[in-house]
Amino acid sequence: MEELIKAPNSNFIIMSNQPYQTTSPEIVEDYIIKRGQPFVLTGTTQGWSRSNMFTLDFLSERYSEMELINSPRNNETHTDLQGWRMKDFISYLQVSPEERNPKHLYGKDIACPREWQEYLSHKLQPQYSYKSRFDLVSHLPDYLQPETLLVYIGSNGTYTPGHIDMCGSLSQNLMVSSDQDAFAWWFIVPTEYKDEALKFWGDKGGDVYNESRFIRPIDLLGAPFPIYVFKQRPGDFIFVPPDSVHQVVNCGPGISTKVAWNSISLKSLPISYFSSLPHTRRMAKPELFRIKAIAYYTLRKIMGDVENTNFNTIDVNDVIDIIAPLLEIFHNILQTESILIPKPNYPYCNGETIPFLQPFKYFNGDRIQDRRCDHCNSDIFNRCYHCETCKTDDGQGKDFCFDCVSSGIGCEFHFKVMVLKEFISHSKLKKELSSFYEIYKNLLAHSGRRPKEVDDIITKSTDRVSDECGFLTTATVAYHVVFYSSQKKIKCHRCEKRFKKFSIIFCTNCNARFCEQCVVNTFGQNFQVLMKRNEWECFCCKGLCDCSNCTSNSNSSNHPRILNNNQQLGLPYNNNNNSNNNNNNNINNNNNNNNNNINNNNNNMNNNNSINNNNNNNNNNNINNNNINNNNHHNNNGNNNLNSSYSSLNALSSLSQQQSYGSYDNYNNNNNNNNYNNNNNNNGHIQILKSGRQYDDEQSSSSGSGSSNSTPTKPRPRNGGDDGLMSHFSGNNNNNNNHHNNNNNNNNNHHMMSHHHHNNNNNNNNNNNPTTSSLSSLSTSLSSSSTSTQKPMDVHSKKRPIVLDNDKPKGRPPKNLKEWTSTHKFIISLIELFRSSNNAILGKPNPHYKPIENLPPLVQLYLSQRKAFGGVLWAKTNSCPLLPCIWVKDLSVIPPNTKLLPSLIQGKKIVVLFFGDQDQEEYVGIVGKKSIFSFDEVNQTLLLKCGEVPLAQLEDLFNTTEPEIAMKKDIAAFNYKNQIEEKEEGLYVKQELYNNKKII
């Protein structure tokens, strides 16, 4: 060893050492805590009168019958021998080394004799003594205190492999006796090189958490980190820093005896809690030291002493330095175990209402904080999930910590029904924390700090805890996971595989969803960190997603998406306006300018853009009815023309897919009229058409007469299709004029795509402005017109209109109130139109909406087997008060293994297929006829409770085809008597119905 230490470029460093008698505890603490380096006190046993007590003769005389637990260890086979007593091991050591068999048995982890413990406590300084007041373990209840005072008896060649002491504890090792020329070599890696040491031992086939490999000194010489070495002899007292990898080998011809113990100090506790515990939990090693309980009981002890102490008799600043880290750790513990359910939306919850927390159950028994997680063996401080069905060896149920449950780990048989349990009321602990903060605040004030400075210290401390625990605490995530475990699987945006919802995070910007596998394996992000955040911008929004949809959208991102200003489009302003406010995609009754956003649709079209940057950037859009090519020519021509030969609604359906408009001249004289007046019921049928994709409205409007250049930006898709709507109103005349009257006067607007300019004066204004229609314009026009604010146009209808004036519902809000989404608005528009137009047709087939393979499975099924269904309706479910669904009349469209109910034969219930991201088995629902709503019966409260995904799929259906609307009178008279047969297992669909039928 001496040669290795002196070798050129050697990474071996002799440990710092000083005499025991002249070295203060502060120096030792500075080395092992602040520097993370080992330290040695020499001559510790010098002058001890009873040094002869630490001999094999003493052990043979007093403790010969003492049973050795898992000792001695055979260093050759790496196994612990069983059934040995002290006299057996001493007899083995008295045999000459050449004759010993096995060759190397190491007496490790032997319980320390009581006499030795008492003598050491008497002789050593309190800062070093086992379970003294400086050892925080002593503050725990007796039943929680671990016994770490152990004896090690070794001969030449025995060793302890490289390892880390558990939970970041401080290791102290004193050689109390040895034969002549017997010693031990220590190899200790500084704390700061912990990760490098873990990798180094791992590369050599070792595991420092399981003491599996001793690396030869010659091999350690080439390690990429410094190694502190020391030759330990009797009286040498070695202090090992927390989280330090170290190994020991006994050398020399004789036998050496060492006494070792571990402790937790005030300065090492933060290292234990924040650094060591996560590693210990990942390795599933039992927490020998209950660090969380240590922090709690130590803080209670100190706070109690402070309350009963006169501040003038103590050094307040020293007490503050002691309390501050303890208070932060205890606050962090309580915050981690707090279940705090925020309002949606956030990355781990996409608009869904998480149910309120039920009261916790209490653990029975007098002992508290004595339970461990049955998966990772980590300490359970106060709260956990508990399976009452599965029993452990002690007859108790299984416990699972919040860290495991938040990762989807729990009882494999009863995960969904695990219950929450606690030892102490969480609210009681929070009150205790508040009282501790008050004491801490008084100490700060007594130290001479100003009130503002005191408040800043408290605020920074609490904010730091909130940041460490995340927007969603670990307990909150675990609560979400258990709740999500009983729900349907959700498809990942990128890989399109289905996962349980607890393995999915949602983009708070575009609602795209990504699974944990894609987040971790493809994009290299920490899923556990992302799901605790309050917002997250996904890889689609950042342009990093490599899925086919995002790639195709990226290829088309060179096309301009949005033209926001009337001057850009060559459209005249409303001359009756004196306001400077411009409104995009909105119909306004306050005399504001109306600007039109035009979206370029890239679905099933070829877009060729020729851009000529001359004087004015006006838009010429030449659309030819003989093909689907959309040619956008940007010239300096002030007049924009539309050449079209479309003369039917079907032609307009194709036209609506091209979504690029300027100012249009219509060369077809067969135009449609609609007299739309609040005082009559003369309404034509209304057709809702929808574009294939939505683009972000990010381009700002230009003002005045200046020209503007539109910068191509990347489109962002939204699941379920686009928000751009176009409606065409047809009536009895041959002019394309829509007459709207707010004050019993007619305002005639010439429309090409049903975009309405409303004026609140009594003059008749004719605006021949060709405009585009968007979802918001249609929805707002419906809500601001008499159809939604006054009595519906169908005088026989008594249904309450859905109000959207302020984009928020009126009246008493539901518990899960959230903002209206574009999909909600689309469905509301359909319902209002259905009510106001005497149940008119709401849609027609649109061949250019989406390829059929991109449609939801239920929409595809409806298109392929339309005759098997009775129409669209709404139904109540256990998980949601309102879900859109399709009434199934022909049971051959459901899986043949679906178990049916007798109430279907009796005519009390019907079979429906629900919209939503569900597995095929979960599509099928059996609902009571009293639990359904016809299409136009829903109200705003129920509609808000419906999720975005099922509504988006319903939106796809209406944009793809003209679906039937289920009528209650038809449902009331219907039953499945002729389609069901009885088998031994129950009722099922007759097998003959599946002949020549497509099964889901």
UniProtKB/Swiss-Prot annotation:
<dbReference type="GO" id="GO:0010629">
    <property type="term" value="P:negative regulation of gene expression"/>
</dbReference>
<dbReference type="Pfam" id="PF02373">
    <property type="entry name" value="JmjC"/>
</dbReference>
<dbReference type="InterPro" id="IPR003347">
    <property type="entry name" value="JmjC_dom"/>
</dbReference>
<dbReference type="GO" id="GO:0008270">
    <property type="term" value="F:zinc ion binding"/>
</dbReference>
<feature type="zinc finger region" description="RING-type; degenerate">
    <location>
        <begin position="492"/>
        <end position="542"/>
    </location>
</feature>
<keyword id="KW-0479">Metal-binding</keyword>
<keyword id="KW-0805">Transcription regulation</keyword>
<feature type="domain" description="JmjC">
    <location>
        <begin position="113"/>
        <end position="280"/>
    </location>
</feature>
<keyword id="KW-0804">Transcription</keyword>
<feature type="compositionally biased region" description="Basic and acidic residues">
    <location>
        <begin position="805"/>
        <end position="818"/>
    </location>
</feature>
<keyword id="KW-0815">Transposition</keyword>
<keyword id="KW-0175">Coiled coil</keyword>
<dbReference type="GO" id="GO:0031152">
    <property type="term" value="P:aggregation involved in sorocarp development"/>
</dbReference>
<dbReference type="GO" id="GO:0032196">
    <property type="term" value="P:transposition"/>
</dbReference>
<dbReference type="InterPro" id="IPR018866">
    <property type="entry name" value="Znf-4CXXC_R1"/>
</dbReference>
<feature type="compositionally biased region" description="Low complexity">
    <location>
        <begin position="760"/>
        <end position="789"/>
    </location>
</feature>
<dbReference type="GO" id="GO:0006907">
    <property type="term" value="P:pinocytosis"/>
</dbReference>
<comment type="function">
    <text>Transcriptional regulator involved in phagocytosis and pinocytosis. Both activates and represses transcription. Regulates expression of acaA, carA, pkaC, csaA, cotB and lagC. Promotes amplification of the tRNA gene-associated retrotransposon TRE5-A, a mobile genetic element formerly called as Dictyostelium repetitive element (DRE). Suppresses agnC and agnE encoding argonaute proteins which are part of a RNA interference pathway controlling TRE5-A amplification.</text>
</comment>
<feature type="compositionally biased region" description="Low complexity">
    <location>
        <begin position="700"/>
        <end position="710"/>
    </location>
</feature>
<dbReference type="Pfam" id="PF10497">
    <property type="entry name" value="zf-4CXXC_R1"/>
</dbReference>
<feature type="region of interest" description="Disordered">
    <location>
        <begin position="660"/>
        <end position="818"/>
    </location>
</feature>
<dbReference type="GO" id="GO:0003677">
    <property type="term" value="F:DNA binding"/>
</dbReference>
<dbReference type="GO" id="GO:0010628">
    <property type="term" value="P:positive regulation of gene expression"/>
</dbReference>
<dbReference type="GO" id="GO:0005634">
    <property type="term" value="C:nucleus"/>
</dbReference>
<feature type="compositionally biased region" description="Low complexity">
    <location>
        <begin position="574"/>
        <end position="647"/>
    </location>
</feature>
<protein>
    <recommendedName>
        <fullName>C-module-binding factor A</fullName>
    </recommendedName>
</protein>
<feature type="zinc finger region" description="PHD-type; atypical">
    <location>
        <begin position="489"/>
        <end position="544"/>
    </location>
</feature>
<feature type="DNA-binding region" description="A.T hook">
    <location>
        <begin position="810"/>
        <end position="818"/>
    </location>
</feature>
<comment type="subunit">
    <text>Monomer.</text>
</comment>
<keyword id="KW-0862">Zinc</keyword>
<keyword id="KW-0254">Endocytosis</keyword>
<keyword id="KW-0539">Nucleus</keyword>
<dbReference type="GO" id="GO:0006909">
    <property type="term" value="P:phagocytosis"/>
</dbReference>
<feature type="compositionally biased region" description="Low complexity">
    <location>
        <begin position="660"/>
        <end position="683"/>
    </location>
</feature>
<feature type="region of interest" description="Disordered">
    <location>
        <begin position="561"/>
        <end position="647"/>
    </location>
</feature>
<feature type="compositionally biased region" description="Low complexity">
    <location>
        <begin position="732"/>
        <end position="751"/>
    </location>
</feature>
<keyword id="KW-0581">Phagocytosis</keyword>
<keyword id="KW-0238">DNA-binding</keyword>
<dbReference type="GO" id="GO:0043565">
    <property type="term" value="F:sequence-specific DNA binding"/>
</dbReference>
<keyword id="KW-0156">Chromatin regulator</keyword>
<keyword id="KW-0863">Zinc-finger</keyword>
<dbReference type="GO" id="GO:0006325">
    <property type="term" value="P:chromatin organization"/>
</dbReference>
